[in-house]
Amino acid sequence: MSFWTQKKVVVTGGRGFIGSHLVERLLEAGANVKVCDSTYSNGAMNDLATRDVEFHDRDLADPENCRKICRGADVVMHLAAKIRGVGYNVKHHGEMFFSNAVMNLNMMEAARVAGVSRFLCVSTVGVYPKDCRVPTPEEDGFKGEPEESGYGYGWAKRQAEVQARCYKSEYGMKIAIVRPYNVYGPRMDFNPETAPVVSSQIRKVLEAKDVLTVWGDGEQSRSFTYVSDEVIGMMLAVEKYPEADPLNIGTSEEIKIKDLVQLIVRLSGKNLQIVFDTSKPAGAARRCPDISKAKRLIGYEPEVRMEEGLQKTIDWYLEPAAVVR
């Protein structure tokens, strides 16, 4: 019998990109799922409308809402977060810190009071400083300051990790902490103002006529995690390592931005001239997680290679029924 069979699981942020995929995987594993979310991100839950999922629209800044949603739950998986684009983040560090810190504090405390058996704290790679080692081990998460572009958000997530450690120490609460790494796949954000690298480049390629302009020289490298690998990692962490100790959930497969763009162009069947604008910011030279800890402790092993994941994402974007913002 699966760990998840008949478990009553609350997923906050379950209408969103990663959350909706997690809900699907939990249902397949035999869990009874309750989704709490105040948004309808990308219509991500449309294809689950007929499934046996209980939906709640709740503001998690209200402690009483959090207590209500946690009552009777076996597991709480807290994915809800206020996330915006870099341009917004750099002007609203206080708002990003407060909004996320309040949700994290409320949900973990509500889960503790409800006596849930497991809690998932979803952190971020934004906890890492700009000068962290690459591949980046988990212990670098509290060295120096979070990157300036996501300073408020990064500190809110660091605070959540500290809260998890404190709750494990005093209350013996079983909490898993994961740090997702550049997740992509169907239902991700394609809004030009807020889209991350993969969806931004897919949209630009598919909408381009003859010339595609890419910021920077394209030499910077990143690793990207397909969403199905990410949610499996989250579930494994809850099941096997609820020790309030962070795990990188990503992939060690790196790709240069110029190669990523060329791959998207090839998969989309377009014939474009690619121009690199070196006057524009390109970000850090290299970003990649050390996932050896997750491999060792929970048996995590990413399975979807970049080309396969990109093709699935492009195919979804081109579907007439896809809801794209």
Annotate each PLM feature.
Residues 57-99, 110-113, 130:
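NAD(P)H-binding glycine-rich loop region in Rossmannoid oxidoreductase-like domains
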Residues 152, 156-159:
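Active-site helix of classical SDR
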Residues 31-40:
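Conserved glycine-rich Rossmann-like NAD(P)H-binding loop of the short-chain dehydrogenase/reductase
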Residues 24-29, 58, 207-325:
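C-terminal substrate-binding subdomain of Rossmann-fold SDR/epimerase-dehydratase oxidoreductases
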Residues 9-29:
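N-terminal Rossmann NAD(P)H-binding glycine-rich loop of SDR-like oxidoreductase domains
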Residues 12, 36, 76-82, 119-125, ...:
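SDR active-site strand-loop-helix element
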Residues 131-140, 162-239, 252-254, 261-267:
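NAD(P)-dependent short-chain dehydrogenase/reductase
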Residues 78, 105-150:
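Conserved Rossmann-fold NAD(P)-dependent oxidoreductase catalytic core, especially the SDR/UDP-sugar
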